[in-house]
Each structure stands twice: as C-alpha cells, then as structure tokens.
C-alpha cells in the first residue's frame, strides 16, 4: 500500500517542513509514503475561483483507483487509536490512499464529491501547513500503534 499526502502550498516559513520531513522519513520504514505539494492558486479569480483551481490541481494528482481521504472540518474526528484502526483497514484492502489537504480557503466541492472519506484533524481551525504536520505525525503514530511500538503511550 502506498500513502500519499497531496497538499496545497509549500511551507515558505520553514517552520513545519523539517518536522514533516522527519516524520515522512520515519514513515518510510513502514510503508511507501510520498508528500506531494501543489501550488496555491492566485487569488485574482476570487476565493471560489482559487478553490476551483486548487481543487482541479489536487484531483489531477489522484489516481483513478486511489482511495481519497480529505481533511475537512466536518469530517470524522478520531482518536489516535481509532485512526490507527482506520489505517489498518486501508492496509487490509491493499488500496493506495491519497490524503488531500486544501489551501487556506478550503476544498472545492468537486474534491469533496470525490472523497471516499472525510477526516478532521481537530475541532480547532488550523493553518493548513500545520494540519499537514499533524496528519503526517498521526500517520507515523498509527504505524507504531499497529506494530506495538512504544512511540504511542
């Protein structure tokens, strides 16, 4: 199984990228993992236009057979253990998974329509780059839970 996080934007501040890279490296011990960054849309077309452009770019990166899981504030809120169980089910299916993170304006309706699942990383509103870090860390945590390793206590 391959897991990809497909996210809008880059961490220009350099604040989150080192931690995301570290967890991505750790994840490589457990599964095939890839972080795909797509460019943010220019706001010239307005919020709806930018969301639509970003949505089209996100969907272009998704394979026809990939399970699509979007991060959405209205998605399922899971504990780390419940998320690990969800990851286990994905692994049992043997289906590749694409986890999509929208930009600062959220996800386009077309992206939400394509989603097989919706997950929320928190009830808080998070910067989308911070949400990326939380998601990658939780993926790593899920793998350690599934393997019975001591990272999750």
UniProtKB/Swiss-Prot annotation:
EC number: 2.1.1.177
Catalytic activity, as annotated: pseudouridine(1915) in 23S rRNA + S-adenosyl-L-methionine = N(3)-methylpseudouridine(1915) in 23S rRNA + S-adenosyl-L-homocysteine + H(+)
UniProt binding sites for S-adenosyl-L-methionine: 71, 102
Main location: cytoplasm
Gene3D superfamilies cross-referenced by the UniProt entry: 3.40.1280.10
EC class (word): transferase
Subcellular location: Cytoplasm
Cellular-component GO terms for this entry: cytoplasm
Entry keywords, A to Z: Cytoplasm, Methyltransferase, rRNA processing, S-adenosyl-L-methionine, Transferase
Pfam families named among the record's database cross-references: SPOUT_MTase
Keyword Iron: no
An annotated Gene Ontology molecular function: rRNA (pseudouridine-N3-)-methyltransferase activity
Similarity comment text for this entry: Belongs to the RNA methyltransferase RlmH family.
Subunit structure: Homodimer.
UniProt function note: Specifically methylates the pseudouridine at position 1915 (m3Psi1915) in 23S rRNA.
UniProt xrefs under PANTHER family: METHYLTRANSFERASE (PTHR33603), RIBOSOMAL RNA LARGE SUBUNIT METHYLTRANSFERASE H (PTHR33603:SF1)
The protein, known as: Ribosomal RNA large subunit methyltransferase H
Species per Swiss-Prot/TrEMBL record: Anaeromyxobacter dehalogenans (strain 2CP-1 / ATCC BAA-258)
């Amino acid at each position: 199984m391959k897991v990809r996080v497909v996210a809008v934007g880059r961490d220009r501040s350099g604040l989150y990228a080192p931690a995301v890279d570290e967890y991505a490296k750790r994840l490589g011990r457990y599964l095939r993992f890839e972080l795909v960054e797509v460019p943010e849309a220019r706001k010239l077309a307005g919020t709806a236009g930018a969301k639509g452009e970003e949505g089209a770019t996100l969907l272009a990166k998704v394979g026809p057979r990939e399970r699509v899981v979007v991060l959405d504030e209205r998605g399922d809120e899971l504990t780390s253990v419940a998320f690990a169980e969800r990851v286990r089910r994905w692994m049992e299916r043997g289906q590749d998974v694409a986890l999509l993170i929208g930009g600062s304006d959220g996800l386009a309706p077309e992206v939400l329509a394509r989603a097989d699942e919706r997950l929320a990383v928190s009830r808080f509103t998070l910067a989308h780059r911070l949400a990326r870090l939380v998601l990658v860390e939780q993926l790593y945590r899920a793998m350690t839970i599934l393997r019975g390793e001591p990272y999750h206590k």
